[in-house]
């Protein structure tokens, strides 16, 4: 009997304002940020905003038609881009703030190690520190 995918670390998905969040903590933070935006303390609140860390890599190769004549150069993607998807991004006093909601932090886990690399790339590429909530 198929029961679907088990949530990681036992968290339960929560829906607020028709938006499904991965955890109660993330949904609660959304409600807090929404209140701050309504009060005018933050602006331009975005959910799941993507930041490109490493662009896609392409290989250029000459293309030939059936007659053997060279056509315009073609491009083939050999590596997809690497992106970081922030839980929340907003502006406070004109400065971009990026937040990632973390429940249980296990430094030994592969998922957290991947996050640490993306956090460092965000600082290097975009000059933005990620706040862990």
Predicted regions and their residues:
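Electrostatic, structured charged patches in enzyme active sites and in nucleic-acid/phosphate-binding
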Residues: 1-133
């Amino acid at each position: 009997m198929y029961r679907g995918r088990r949530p990681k670390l036992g968290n339960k998905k929560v829906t607020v304002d028709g938006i499904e969040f991965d955890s109660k903590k993330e949904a609660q933070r959304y409600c807090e940020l929404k209140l701050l935006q309504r009060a005018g303390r933050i602006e331009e609140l975005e959910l799941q905003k993507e930041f490109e860390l490493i662009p896609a890599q392409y290989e250029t190769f000459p293309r030939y038609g059936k007659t053997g004549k060279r056509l315009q150069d073609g491009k083939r993607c050999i590596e997809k881009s690497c992106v970081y998807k922030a839980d929340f991004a907003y502006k406070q006093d004109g400065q971009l703030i990026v937040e990632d909601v973390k429940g249980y932090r296990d430094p030994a886990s592969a998922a957290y190690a991947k996050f640490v690399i993306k956090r460092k790339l965000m600082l290097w590429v975009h000059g933005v520190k990620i706040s862990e909530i």
